[in-house]
Amino acid sequence: MEQNEFMEAIMYVNGVRRVLPDGLAHMTLLEYLRDLGLTGTKLGCGEGGCGSCTVMVSSYDRESKTCVHYAVNACLAPLYSVEGMHVISIEGVGHRKLGLHPLQESLASSHGSQCGFCTPGFVMSMYALLRSSKNSPSEEEIEECLAGNLCRCTGYRPIIDAFRVFAKSDDALYSGLSSLSLQDGSNICPSTGKPCSCGSKTTSEAATCNEDRFQSISYSDIDGAKYTDKELIFPPELLLRKLAPLKLGGNEGITWYRPVSLQNLLELKANFPDAKLLVGNTEVGIEMRLKRLQYPVLISAAQVPELNALNVNDNGIEVGSALRLSELLRLFRKVVKERPAHETSACKAFIEQLKWFAGTQIRNVACIGGNICTASPISDLNPLWMASRAEFRIINCNGDVRSIPAKDFFLGYRKVDMGSNEILLSVFLPWTRPLEYVKEFKQAHRRDDDIAIVNGGMRVFLEEKGQQLFVSDASIVYGGVAPLSLRARNTEELLIGKNWNKCLLQDALKVIQSDVLIKEGAPGGMVEFRKSLTLSFFFKFFLWVTHHVNNVNPTIETFPPSHMSAVQLVPRFSRIGKQDYETVKQGTSVGLPEVHLSARMQVTGEAEYTDDTPLPPCTLHAALVLSKVPHARILSVDDSAAKSSSGFVGLFLAKDVPGNNMIGPIVADEELFATDVVTCVGQVIGVLVADTHENAKTAARKVDVRYQELPAILSIKEAINAKSFHPNTERRLRKGDVELCFQSGQCDRIIEGEVQMGGQEHFYLEPNGSLVWTIDGGNEVHMISSTQAPQQHQKYVSHVLGLPMSKVVCKTKRLGGGFGGKETRSAFIAAAASVPSYLLNRPVKLILDRDVDMMITGHRHSFVGKYKVGFTNEGKILALDLEIYNNGGNSMDLSLSNLERAMFHSDNVYEIPHVRIVGNVCFTNFPSNTAFRGFGGPQGMLITENWIQRIAAELDKIPEEIKEMNFQVEGSITHYFQSLQHCTLHQLWKELKVSSNFLKTRREADEFNSHNRWKKRGVAMVPTKFGISFTTKFMNQAGALVHVYTDGTVLVTHGGVEMGQGLHTKVAQVAATAFNILLSSVFVSETSTDKVPNASPTAASASSDMYGAAVLDACEQIIARMEPVASKHNFNTFSELASACYFQRIDLSAHGFHIVPELEFDWVSGKGNAYRYYTYGAAFAEVEIDTLTGDFHTRKADIMLDLGYSLNPTIDIGQIEGAFVQGLGWVALEELKWGDAAHKWIKPGSLLTCGPGSYKIPSINDMPFQLNVSLLKGNPNAKAIHSSKAVGEPPFFLAASAFFAIKEAIKAARSEVGLTNWFPLETPATPERIRMACFDEFSAPFANSDFCPKLSV
């Protein structure tokens, strides 16, 4: 088969025709779009896991003669896979100059975009849903379509609110053919279902349709704003375009084939038996990118009609192997409505399983055959095919077809019964029979878009004999427990012929244990959990079948009603929330809920990030050469293979560094490039530059480094035992006399224990990156970096290049999220890129891939706390003795300051007369850990709340009673001797307790628990007191530069960085109020070291306080200069005043400066004012857990904070919601798994969870069903600008309310089996930890009641 020489390979992008040249078979759609300058589509992960690359693809379905619109991940889609299609990116939806689409305006005005990096992806997912909907989508459909999109900033609530309005619109406002035809009475474009005159033409005429490529749309107005009234139509040329075979080439000898008939495909398969067949590239793309596998021949089977065929008959359903999973889901939903209920039991099981399979973007392109033939041992669908009596139709290159039962198809790990000359043609699924039941099972870390830990498909066919039911046939299949989808053959044999009763259940549960054998140390870990799930799933299946057959035959032995909640499906509840705040307007803008200044740029994709910056001529691309072992001597570095790699320019090592190779934010204890010894996996050995990003990465992988391995320390415990601590990091705080208190008899009870908590990945959606270039012959170095600390970049680059700081400039426009992760570690990226840029005198761009970013840039510190607490029988706390350790990794970075804040916050909000705290920073052979929202404070408070819970358990009281009894009050003296002033803790706690209906909800939870054996609810309230300011005194300073122009507009530059937290917006509000002008007259452009020097990092939640005050200082200087002119004339506008001042030669520029007063702490005495003030807060949470699987959801969360007079209440509420959901990830979802003693199946020192496929941050489905936020009213804060308070970090810890609610629910479960004593629960409380803590007859065969799953700390 050869390419039709007369047929160009084309596509349309945003209505513009594009010819696709040969040679791009290696390229993804995302790379192509960004090369076109369409940078609104972002690269967030490169594996289809975050949704930031989402675009809409439209294609013409010749079978149905309709145009179909669907969202896809551009980062996985091969460029040639969209040949003959229309791709619409965010730029094609709407933009500021021509007008925003209603989706974009709604998202912006609803405060649904913070950092903005994920925003275009959300817009495109929703846009594709609207374009593909014949009727207005339901709220469930909206949330389902967003399941493949991640946001780290907002907590999702405002995004859902923004899009919810489209679920309420009239059906006629959507693009369905019938509704628009009825509405307009006009001709309908067959491609779009929208009015178009080409619809009245003949087919040949339509090809030359002269209608504009846009068509009018009619959506509900939102806020009366003006929107674009244009929608891109499907290009008429593509309607007539005949499908033709394609043969196109690519880099490294790749050839792309697209057959358009089964015969074409079989010919290709005969010629290239080892070729990779693909449809959506969702598996092959990952293999090529992450596993570095090479496939020289790729055959796209997507356009083969025979592989997309559907046939529904009296025997069942036959579907082609190339059918997309989203189409399969629609088909099953259709037949369930149309066929008798008893026939569709398997279809219903597939519907439920597909609903939680990946995200919408993946389901839209992934096909049935790919999922089957990949033969993944954790495939969600293969166990169901096997259990449902499905048959696979296989065709060889001669056209011979054979059938094989699905249950016999899988032979071993990634091995199937199919020869290299065969392909999967179709799948046949028979209808189920009366009394035949099929059920799906899956447990993952997260419900949405996650791979299974264990899954299953189960079927039983029953026959009635008298008053009893006997098993005629059965299939029990598990995934995630063996190298292949595993049939429990002995269990199946046991079941067949037996009476369906509880005795059979018990017998089957015993046999399953011998059918499913997982060895200790097996890949994937979680052995006890996985084994217990096999029993839990079967028990659920037995319950479910019994419930159904009882409706048919009421005489069948059944189970108590309290058991039946175990088989209820997890619904997609509509997420709702309330926001309660007062608006204290000050001047023209301060206090108002203004929209984020960049929101409308972000929703249109026009906002630029580091990777979007247009490249200077001759730019080189860099990749890092990284250590592959945790501790070793470097014997040699051989770059000979790299030199022969395509596009190679140079490799730069420590010997090439012009200045000093030793760097570090506080202590210069790190090498930029390792010289003799590496101390972690991922340590940078050198930087390689090439002509393209891909060529740089390819060449870097070819650099051969030889090592002599050395012993490694891979946990806090190992560090403690080896006394491996960073030098001079022991810290001590003391108040009262702990020993005397313990020995005096004052304490009725003394408890001792240990708290461990894992780390957390920042998972900012924008990876770290820098673009560095020289100017003036190399005399100056400039850079654009994704950083919270431009001054740090300036300092590092100056240091390693041997240049004065005055010749180095760092600029930052905005960040796609930071959360502390871009405070210090990002500076290493800029410094590494600066070396080749300086030496070669060429621009160098270094953007980290997601897996590299997660591996090398550090995380939230894991902690271990060892406590001893004395208290009275009433619950009054008397003494705390605490040893606290954090995992610093292989360098100091900010770990000491992190430890100090943890120690400061180890009282949380409690009055403790006698305190002794000793802290140490552990040296381990992991990449250096770093700042993360809360900066040690949450870890210190979590240790405290754990022993508070234990006191309550010891005294048989509810934890909230112990908390209230020990609250600090106005004037309390902390253990570091700072007096609490304006303490609003009691007030907000009392108000929250009432507004959340705490007592009523607790009673309702107890009632629910008494009636439900396998589902349990728990409630908890948690307070917080978070200190505001840097604990390093000199960092509490800020500068700003303000210019007033003669037209009355104002340009503000300050030292803070906008990373989604709304800093620029708040600062602009301060300036607008100061000058009594509208916010629209104030502009904040960027942060730059040549405008505001020596700026502190944007961190510690202090930026609004500091930079707002600095801007106000500058404004007041200008106002004072303007006053003589203003007092003499009555100016109508500020522009008139500014112009008059200009003519009077008055300086309209000012540099503002602010220092935070009253800060002084001495570690020698352990006394002083560590903080300027405190932000107080409290949260209530109600959760529900499935005790059989560990699955949980947060039913409700109520949060209240004291933020004084908020500068911008909606921005602050966005910070609260985002922090809470991020905190929910820390306490319950996100687990870093390292190669350590706890995970010996992982390569030592390596991070397994280095991408969204394995590391799960909260998705939309993980946010609380109801998320209510209120701000305490009437409490101005005299210690910050305009009586406000800091907000970024304080709410984070409040997610611990969900953690302790989970623990309460587990407590209720344990009480069912007589376990009433206190028990430990480590964070994160993943499904594994929840389930294994809920000890019962299904976990007992594998673990004791005190079993604690392994944790990397």
UniProtKB/Swiss-Prot annotation:
Pfam families per the record? Ald_Xan_dh_C, CO_deh_flav_C, FAD_binding_5, Fer2, Fer2_2, MoCoBD_1, MoCoBD_2
Q: Which residues bind Mo-molybdopterin?
A: Q788, F819, R933, A1100
Q: Which residues bind substrate?
A: E823, R901, F935, T1031
The residue range of the signal peptide is none
Looking up SMART domains in the UniProt record yields: Ald_Xan_dh_C (SM01008), CO_deh_flav_C (SM01092)
InterPro entries registered for this protein in UniProt? 2Fe-2S-bd, 2Fe-2S-bd_dom_sf, 2Fe-2S_ferredoxin-like_sf, 2Fe-2S_ferredoxin-type, 2Fe2S_fd_BS, Ald_Oxase/Xan_DH_a/b, Ald_Oxase/Xan_DH_a/b_sf, Ald_Oxase/xanthine_DH-like
Highest taxon of the lineage: Eukaryota
Let me know which tissues express this protein, per UniProt.
Expressed in roots, leaves, stems, flowers and siliques.
User: Where in this chain does the record put each FAD-binding PCMH-type domain?
Assistant: 249-434
Q: Which Gene3D superfamilies match?
A: 3.10.20.30, 3.30.465.10, [2Fe-2S]-binding domain, Aldehyde oxidase/xanthine dehydrogenase, a/b hammerhead, Aldehyde oxidase/xanthine dehydrogenase, molybdopterin binding domain, CO dehydrogenase flavoprotein, C-terminal domain, Uridine Diphospho-n-acetylenolpyruvylglucosamine Reductase, domain 2
Q: Where is the 2Fe-2S ferredoxin-type domain?
A: 7-93
Reactions catalysed, semicolon-separated, are:
xanthine + NAD(+) + H2O = urate + NADH + H(+); hypoxanthine + NAD(+) + H2O = xanthine + NADH + H(+)
Q: Name one GO biological process term.
A: xanthine metabolic process
Q: Which residues are annotated as active site? A: E1289 (proton acceptor)
State the family it belongs to: Belongs to the xanthine dehydrogenase family.
Q: How does it assemble?
A: Homodimer.
Q: Anything further noted?
A: Plants silencing simultaneously XDH1 and XDH2 show reduced growth, impaired silique development, increased seed sterility, precocious senescence of mature leaves and overaccumulation of xanthine.
Supply the name of the protein: Xanthine dehydrogenase 2
Q: Which organism is it from?
A: Arabidopsis thaliana (Mouse-ear cress)
